[in-house]
Structures are given as structure tokens and as C-alpha cells.
Amino acid sequence: LSKSSIKKYQAMKDKKIDVMVIFTTDGQLAISDVVVLEDDKKMYPSYRAGTVVRSEILSKYPELKAVLEKLNNILDDKTMADLNYQVESEGKKPEDVAREYLQEKGLLEVKQW
């Protein structure tokens, strides 16, 4: 998050503002008590992660499809907000947060040398 994004969450907490535009993957949502309104008009796009692979790569490495399919639907907005919070507010390295999460999900095994 940018400093201005963190400031807007602080302004909400301090009751200086009543409404703000957010991303549902904002790290600050993990620790905030703001109420996120439903986007019933679908004005804002989804920021959910997905995998995209060229067909020629899958033809060359067919085993890749099964590996990548394991990543489907493991990240929802709340999880992304939690992971983003670890990077944005706790100062963890993105690669460390990703590694820990994938290990928790049983998708990555780290072997010691």
C-alpha cells in the first residue's frame, strides 16, 4: 500500500472520513474494522489471481497443466489481504510470504541442503 492508502485507513479509524474506495485485497483490511459494502452493480473488477499459459508451452510440457491447476482457487480476497498485510505492514519479503503460504497449502516442499 502507498502511504496515502495507509493514511486513508487511519483517517477512517480516527473518524475523519466516513467512506473510502478500497481494494478488497488491501493489506490493511486484515486488521481494520471497516465494513466493505457489496459491489452489487459489479463496477469494480475482480483482482483474484489466475494462471495463464500459452498453449505451445503446455504442448511442450504437458505435466505443467496439473501443477498449475493446483493453484486454482487457493487465493480469495481475504487471504490476499492477509498476505499483503504481511508484506506492507510487517515488512516481510514477498518471496518469503509466498513460500510460507505455499508450504502451508502443501504446494511447495523446501528441502534443506
Language model: regions and residue ranges:
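Short helix-initiation/N-cap motifs at beta->coil->alpha
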Residues: 1-10
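Ligand-binding "clamshell"
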Residues: 12-17, 28-41
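Paired acidic/hydrophobic, glycine-rich loop segments that form the ligand-binding mouth/hinge
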Residues: 17-23
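Short secondary-structure boundary segments
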Residues: 23-25, 55
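Short Pro/Gly-enriched coil loops immediately N-terminal to beta-strands
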Residues: 39-49
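A bilobed periplasmic-binding-protein/Venus flytrap-type ligand-binding module shared by bacterial periplasmic
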Residues: 48-61
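Ligand-binding clefts/hinges and TM-proximal coupling segments of bilobed small-molecule sensing domains
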Residues: 63-110
